[in-house]
Amino acid sequence: MPATNILANLFVTLYNTEARRRGDCQVYPTSKLGVEVLGTLKKAGYIGEFEHVEDSRGGKFSVHLLAKITKCGAISPRFKVKKGEYTFWEQQYLPSYDRGMLVVTTNQGVMSHHEAAERGIGGFLIGYVY
């Protein structure tokens, strides 16, 4: 059965593979947003290298895990966040102030909420990881 929410499928696959203490995982299918989210997670140090493998069924990601994800998930519906409202959403989704990050999509691309607050821009919440 095809995945209806590709981003939620990506986060669930990462979380389940981390919970099983595996080093690598395969995520099907792929999307451009998934590439940007994985790039953000890699830049933050939650995952290692990842590779997009194109096949005839929507492609797949091959992701190397670093055993640094305790919990992650997609945020649905995608809530709109103004530039000064990140602390409210941190309290909703993250366990403490300095632990973890919210993944935000903005008009300047996908980034962490720390980077978006530093730039002074808002966007839509699409996921969290800690």
Swiss-Prot record:
Domain of life: Archaea
Chain segments annotated as transmembrane: none
Gene Ontology CC entries for this record: ribonucleoprotein complex; ribosome
GO molecular function terms noted in the UniProt entry: rRNA binding; structural constituent of ribosome
Stored InterPro entries: Ribosomal_uS8, Ribosomal_uS8_CS, Ribosomal_uS8_sf
Matches recorded under Pfam families: Ribosomal_S8 (PF00410)
Keyword annotations of the record: Ribonucleoprotein, Ribosomal protein, RNA-binding, rRNA-binding
Functional description taken from the UniProt entry: One of the primary rRNA binding proteins, it binds directly to 16S rRNA central domain where it helps coordinate assembly of the platform of the 30S subunit.
Complex formation: Part of the 30S ribosomal subunit.
HAMAP family for the chain: Ribosomal_uS8_A
Protein name: Small ribosomal subunit protein uS8
Gene source species: Cenarchaeum symbiosum (strain A)
